[in-house]
Amino acid sequence: SALDRLNARTDELIDQLGLGTYRDHRAADLSYGRKRVLEIATTLALDPQVLLLDEPMAGMGREDVAMVAGIIRNVATERAVLMVEHNLSVVADICDHVTVLQRGEILARGDYATVSADPRVRTAYMGNDA
């Protein structure tokens, strides 16, 4: 039945995203990082071809950032991921292609090494001394 398929998909995502320990917890009782993982899981339950993420690392501590970055990296093997993110170490670690915007205009695009070396990007996002 449809409910059986939904329950099976839910169990698969819970295990895939490392939420098994929290299976019987209320979402409100989860840590901030685990709540973000749950948000990703609810989106993945719909099996999208493209996963859109807006600042997925915002407000997270280093440990949660590493956990969520790993999940996004794994998810990206099965679908396209479009992510807005200001944590440059995460961008460097996860992204194959980077587009930098400034005031709605494309400032630079390419792989992280190319984009991060662009003087306009360095001035705009990393400061003049970067």
Predicted regions and their residues:
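Glycine-rich phosphate-binding loops of nucleotide-dependent enzymes
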Residues: S1-A130
